[in-house]
Structure formats: structure tokens, C-alpha cells
From Swiss-Prot:
This is 3-demethoxyubiquinol 3-hydroxylase. Gene3D superfamilies: 1.20.1260.10. It comes from Acidovorax sp. (strain JS42). Pfam families: COQ7 (PF03232). Pathway: Cofactor biosynthesis; ubiquinone biosynthesis.
Length: 205
């Protein structure tokens, strides 16, 4: 019951409260930049997609922490979720600075990620960790793509995405070291297809 209450609290905080980072944003020490209308529009769309990714990460990690019976794994998942909360706060702060907003479909993204996390975790802890590894690897690749697309002048957004990308790689390595099983190719393809739908939609809505 306590775990379910923690998950419910996480959902409410993720979707309806202003996220509070435990660590200052990498963009905070950088000066404000003057972007053109087109540059601002592109940065806003990309950071909105990144914010959606962090909403999904909260749903995924919370679902998995609810199911596992391994206290150490639960602790590790919750620690990763706290780091993802930093990312959530940083991307939200950057959206605010750009004069933009999060995706209107965040409740849908959170619910979908939570459901997928529950299914993966019920198979086994190793399968659950395998899902984490594949998710973090895909997110890392996606963030690398955003670094190539973000305007060179948008140093604050680039600093945030660069730090997030390094954190996601570390999360994948930690899950792999904890005993993750590799996902079968069909599962990886399905995840990529679902991510494509999410990123394309969040880019606009």
C-alpha cells in the first residue's frame, strides 16, 4: 500500500505540480540568449519532447518500483526516478524561459509508460531491467539527435540536453550491471515505433 501511495503521489507531482530539482539546472549559470522566432520555435518543440520523455520516465520507474520485491532494486529505481525528476524540472524551466509549455497530452504519456512498466516488471526483475536498458539507450540516442538539431546559439538548452544524455547512458549501464536481460528484437522495434509516435505528437501538441 505504501508503494502505491508513493506512485500516486509521483503521478500527481509529475502531472500537476511544479517539479523541484535536487540539483540546479546546467543552464542556470549561462547567460540568456537572443534567439530568432524560428530558433525559439524549434528549441521549444525539442524541449517539449524532452519534457515528455521525463514524464514517461517517472511513470516507468514508479511502476517498476511498485512491482519488484527486491528492496535493493526498488531503492535503485527510486534513485533513478529522483534523477529523472531533475531532468523534468530542468526541461520545464527551459520551456518557461522559451515562453512555451509542456505537452497537453502528458497524462496520456504518463499512463502509457506506467502501464508498460507494470507489464515489464511482472515478467521478472531482469526483464524489467532489460526494458530500462533499452529505454535509456533509445533516449540517449534521441538526445544526441536533439543536440545536432538544437540551434547552436541556444546554449542553455544544449547544456541541459548534454547533461541529460550523459545521465541516461549511466542509467543504462547501471541497469545492465544489475542483471538486465536483453529484449528480443520485436520488443525493441515496438518500443521505437511507440517512441516515434510520442515524439512526433509531442513536437506539436
Amino acid at each position: 500500500m505504501d508503494t502505491l501511495l508513493v506512485a500516486a503521489d509521483s503521478a500527481l507531482r509529475t502531472l500537476f505540480a511544479r517539479p523541484r530539482a535536487g540539483e540546479p539546472s546546467p543552464a542556470r549559470s549561462l547567460p540568456a540568449v537572443d534567439l530568432s522566432v524560428e530558433q525559439r520555435r524549434l528549441s521549444s518543440a525539442l524541449m517539449r519532447v524532452n519534457h515528455v520523455g521525463e514524464v514517461c520516465a517517472q511513470g516507468l520507474y514508479m511502476a517498476q518500483s511498485c512491482v519488484t520485491r527486491d528492496p535493493q532494486l526498488r531503492s535503485d529505481l527510486l534513485a533513478a526516478a529522483r534523477e529523472e525528476t531533475d531532468h523534468l524540472a530542468w526541461t520545464r524551466e527551459r520551456l518557461d524561459a522559451l515562453g512555451s509549455r509542456p505537452s497537453l497530452l502528458n497524462p496520456l504519456w504518463f499512463a502509457g509508460a506506467f502501464a508498460i512498466g507494470l507489464v515489464a516488471a511482472r515478467v521478472s526483475d531482469q526483464a524489467s531491467l532489460g526494458f530500462v536498458v533499452e529505454t535509456e539507450r533509445q533516449v540517449s540516442a534521441h538526445l544526441q539527435g536533439h543536440l545536432r538539431r538544437l540551434p547552436e546559439a541556444d546554449l542553455p538548452s544544449r547544456a541541459i540536453v548534454d547533461r541529460m544524455q550523459r545521465d541516461e547512458e549511466r542509467h543504462a549501464a547501471q541497469a545492465q550491471a544489475a542483471g538486465a536481460l536483453p529484449l528480443p528484437p520485436p520488443a525493441r522495434w515496438l518500443m521505437k515505433a511507440a517512441a516515434k509516435v510520442m515524439t512526433t505528437t509531442a513536437h506539436h501538441i
